[in-house]
């Protein structure tokens, strides 16, 4: 097309290019022919229009949905194919053509699929709320993921899962339909394992999960109360086998992590940009902050790359004369440093091991799951940056008779995270890597083998902090089948959670690269001279220059002193769930289907916390309270709270075609004053 357009252009007398009217008209015609508008009508097998069918151009960006009459209109490229998808129907692909009529086929398997909802289950075909059922085998089973939260990334529409810090062992941040939080609250969804709230989705081994449902609308709050204001993630753990068999399964995976996007720092072009910006704004030379640059030093930086680029490694010591120069007022750098490479590994290993025992003997079924996760972090400079998790899960169920089934289970999770104590460093390790010019030495020692005052060095010097989270719960329950259509379920759960965090503040040391360097004096008290390659030479050598070095100092962050700190948190919680479900069918062909559910939920918690700190470490490499001689600070707290909720749900289906659902919860919390303690949560 470009060739045809250029042939229609003519050159004016002044040398300018002029496009003819014919060329312009032809170009418009080509653009108009690049897309076509396709209209169509979508029905079910009986010819009834389908509302809300998603129609997408295959391999393109155009997407529309059918209107109330099942009609759609979409603009696509000629000869495109259309992909149609709709819950309960088989996905369909057709060739795009004018005035289409498309008949979709029902997916019987999907329609009969059972989805876990609040205190019960529903056929997928009868869902009225915004519920997404996750394909666990596809999303979790085939991927080397550290936890279920990371496995849900990009899986559930309307749910965002991110790991803001990127640290191993950190909890993924899950947001459903928006980011707005309540005052002094959060906007995290309620996470439930077998109808019991758990503090973190990391406490569940992905290998122990049977199903995951995500509740996204107001119906979640109307069943689970105020805690579910931002949605609910319902996790159901694996139960025993349905047939007489005994299975032992061992799985493992070994993987390596790498940054999704390489962090590219500006090279010589960044220095050129700094110079040009200073010139354009009429600023005085030299440009830059702690490390300066002018035309002469820029030329030497270019020369340095030609001479030493690829030969001097990123972590080789910085050498005066070769890599930098001081004129008595300003420091000038020639060498570009790579703080990102010095701080971040190229690859970090990870391994997972899972053992499961599943079986059934008589009317008793059981499932036992054991898991181990070892994961290294990406911080190359740290002494330790890793995460280890142990998991154990047991579920046992036994049918006493046709009326009573009892069950018991237990869950144990131990998460241990080791990481550098960068919270006490002077310079934020990530901020300054981006903020500083690449002339600022990072990830190197000076030519005398001394540390420098910079983020990579501070991370390397920092002690290893430790965060350990332990969680244990045990549950007992029973199901009473009073009639074929009426059952009662009762579950009691006790859980215990502990958190221990150990941190320390140490004194750092390093050559001061921020400010004025000092003269390089030898052991005889004489000024040292160097040449342009950094070699020591006599003072009368041609090109010799007086040497300088970075003054070495010990320092603390934010005027603190060395210390060791410990934070300890303990929580005990008791949960009682009891609900009954009754199914009623009316009509000759049972075309009227009702389901009634009533229940109550009681949660009581008591917790205590302790924080201790002691200053003046005797041995900074071994931070312990017994090895500190300074002041001691202690604070502690204890509290309890309880929540009681009564809830109910009514479902009605007429011929499995017309559906109605209503939910209602009356919720009370001891956290509020008596006159504000109770409230209603309805949904229809």
Language-model features, listed with the residues they occupy:
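Short secondary-structure boundary/capping elements
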Residues: 66, 349, 638-642, 650
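Short glycine/threonine-rich loop-to-helix capping motif typified by GTGT followed
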Residues: 674-678
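Short, small/polar-rich motifs associated with maturation and membrane association
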Residues: 1-392, 405-407
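Residues on the lipid-exposed face of transmembrane beta-strands in outer-membrane beta-barrel proteins
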Residues: 237, 250, 355-359, 394-398, ...
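Outer-membrane beta-barrel channels and translocator barrels
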Residues: 145, 350, 361-362, 397-405, ...
């Amino acid at each position: 097309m470009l060739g045809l357009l250029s042939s229609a252009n003519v050159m004016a007398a002044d040398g300018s290019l002029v496009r003819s009217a014919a060329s312009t008209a032809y170009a418009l015609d080509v653009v108009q022919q690049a897309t076509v508008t396709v209209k169509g009508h979508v029905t079910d097998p009986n010819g009834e229009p389908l509302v809300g069918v998603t129609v997408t151009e295959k391999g393109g960006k155009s997407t529309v949905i059918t209107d109330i009459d099942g009609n759609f209109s979409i603009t696509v490229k000629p000869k495109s194919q259309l992909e149609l998808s709709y819950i309960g129907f088989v996905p369909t692909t057709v060739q795009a053509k004018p005035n289409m009529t498309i008949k979709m086929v029902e997916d019987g398997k999907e329609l009969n699929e059972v989805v876990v909802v609040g205190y019960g289950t529903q056929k997928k075909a009868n869902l009225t709320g915004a519920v997404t059922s996750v394909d666990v085998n596809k999303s979790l089973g085939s991927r080397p993921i550290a936890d279920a939260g990371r496995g849900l990334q990009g899986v559930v529409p309307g749910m965002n899962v991110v790991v803001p810090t990127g640290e191993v062992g950190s909890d993924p941040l899950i947001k459903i339909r928006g980011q707005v939080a309540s005052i002094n609250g959060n906007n995290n969804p309620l996470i439930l394992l077998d109808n019991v709230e758990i503090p973190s989705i990391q406490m569940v081994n992905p290998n122990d999960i049977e199903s995951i449902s995500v509740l996204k609308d107001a119906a979640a709050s109307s069943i689970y109360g105020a805690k579910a204001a931002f949605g609910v993630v319902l996790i159901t753990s694996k139960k025993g086998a349905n047939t007489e068999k005994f299975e032992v399964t061992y799985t493992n995976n070994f993987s390596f992590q790498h940054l999704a996007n390489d962090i590219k720092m500006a090279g010589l072009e960044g220095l050129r940009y700094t110079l040009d910006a200073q010139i354009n704004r009429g600023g005085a030379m030299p440009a830059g902050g702690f490390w300066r640059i002018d035309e002469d030093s820029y030329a030497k930086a270019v020369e340095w790359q030609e001479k030493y680029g690829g030969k001097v490694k990123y972590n080789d010591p910085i050498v005066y004369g070769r890599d930098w120069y001081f004129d008595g007022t300003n420091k000038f750098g020639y060498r570009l440093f790579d703080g990102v490479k010095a701080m971040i590994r190229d690859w970090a290993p990870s391994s997972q091991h899972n053992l499961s025992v599943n079986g059934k003997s008589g009317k008793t079924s059981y499932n036992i799951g054991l898991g181990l996760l070892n994961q290294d972090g990406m911080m190359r400079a740290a002494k330790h940056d890793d995460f280890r998790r142990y998991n154990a899960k047991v579920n046992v169920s036994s049918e006493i008779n046709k009326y009573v089934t009892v069950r018991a289970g237990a869950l144990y999770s131990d998460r241990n995270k080791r990481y550098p104590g960068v919270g006490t460093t002077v310079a934020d390790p990530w901020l300054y890597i981006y903020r500083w010019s690449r002339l600022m030495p990072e990830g190197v020692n000076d030519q005398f083998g001394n540390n420098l005052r910079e983020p990579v060095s501070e991370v390397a010097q920092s002690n290893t902090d430790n965060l350990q989270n332990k969680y244990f719960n045990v549950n007992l329950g029973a199901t009473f089948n009073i009639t074929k259509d009426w059952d009662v379920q009762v579950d009691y759960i006790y859980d215990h959670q502990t958190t221990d965090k150990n941190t320390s503040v140490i004194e750092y040391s390093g050559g001061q690269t921020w400010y004025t360097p000092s003269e390089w004096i030898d052991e005889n008290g004489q000024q040292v001279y160097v040449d342009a390659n950094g070699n020591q030479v006599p003072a009368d050598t041609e090109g010799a220059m007086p040497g300088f070095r970075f003054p070495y100092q010990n320092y603390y962050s934010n005027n603190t002193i060395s210390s060791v700190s410990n934070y300890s948190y303990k929580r005990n919680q008791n949960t009682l769930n009891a609900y009954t479900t009754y199914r009623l069918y009316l009509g000759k062909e049972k075309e009227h289907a009702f389901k009634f559910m009533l229940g109550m939920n009681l949660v009581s918690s008591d917790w205590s916390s302790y924080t201790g700190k002691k200053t003046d470490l005797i041995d900074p490499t071994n931070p312990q309270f017994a090895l500190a001689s300074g002041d001691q600070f202690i604070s502690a707290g204890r509290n309890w709270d309880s929540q009681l909720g009564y809830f109910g749900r009514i479902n009605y289906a007429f011929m499995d075609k017309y559906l109605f659902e209503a939910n209602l919860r009356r919720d009370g919390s001891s956290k509020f004053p008596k006159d504000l303690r109770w409230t209603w949560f309805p949904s229809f």
